């Protein structure tokens, strides 16, 4: 009867992170903590860190996809800063967003001014016809 331990107690559900509830890989809890500690506002709503984590995850996925394509175009299996640079600078919107950002070891986009290219002479034009 009594004294046999807790028999009718509530079973606590397994803890589920806010990231998994939102279906995200980025840490919602960490983003929330950083928003609170960063003195951006006196109070931080419950939806703000979820939204911010989702935006950060989307931007990261977008950049990594383009950088992966750049790595594959260069016949490489590892993404290096050069691939990130090529991905960002060749995408119009990402270039506008990250226009003032310098990527270490990124290099520059290959570009030769049209004026500097050798002109086709008359003899080359007649040979090609």
Curated annotation (Swiss-Prot):
Annotated keywords: Acetylation, Chromosome, DNA-binding, Isopeptide bond, Methylation, Nucleosome core, Nucleus, Phosphoprotein, Ubl conjugation
Protein task: Core component of nucleosome. Nucleosomes wrap and compact DNA into chromatin, limiting DNA accessibility to the cellular machineries which require DNA as a template. Histones thereby play a central role in transcription regulation, DNA repair, DNA replication and chromosomal stability. DNA accessibility is regulated via a complex set of post-translational modifications of histones, also called histone code, and nucleosome remodeling.
Any GO CC annotation of this UniProt entry: extracellular exosome
Major subcellular site: nucleus
Family assignment from sequence similarity: Belongs to the histone H2A family.
Name of the protein described by the UniProt record: Histone H2A.J
Protein's cellular compartments: Nucleus; Chromosome
PTM statement from Swiss-Prot or TrEMBL: Monoubiquitination of Lys-120 (H2AXK119ub) gives a specific tag for epigenetic transcriptional repression. Following DNA double-strand breaks (DSBs), it is ubiquitinated through 'Lys-63' linkage of ubiquitin moieties. Phosphorylation on Ser-2 (H2AS1ph) is enhanced during mitosis. Phosphorylation on Ser-2 by RPS6KA5/MSK1 directly represses transcription. Acetylation of H3 inhibits Ser-2 phosphorylation by RPS6KA5/MSK1. Phosphorylation at Thr-121 (H2AT120ph) by DCAF1 is present in the regulatory region of many tumor suppresor genes and down-regulates their transcription.
N5-methylglutamine carried by residues: 105
Record-level GO BP terms: heterochromatin formation
Modified residues (N6-lactoyllysine): 10
Subunit description: The nucleosome is a histone octamer containing two molecules each of H2A, H2B, H3 and H4 assembled in one H3-H4 heterotetramer and two H2A-H2B heterodimers. The octamer wraps approximately 147 bp of DNA.
GO molecular function: DNA binding; protein heterodimerization activity; structural constituent of chromatin
Organism annotation: Homo sapiens (Human)
Pfam family, one: Histone
Residues recorded with modification N6-acetyllysine: 6, 10
Region annotated Disordered, chain positions: 1-22
Protein origin, superkingdom: Eukaryota
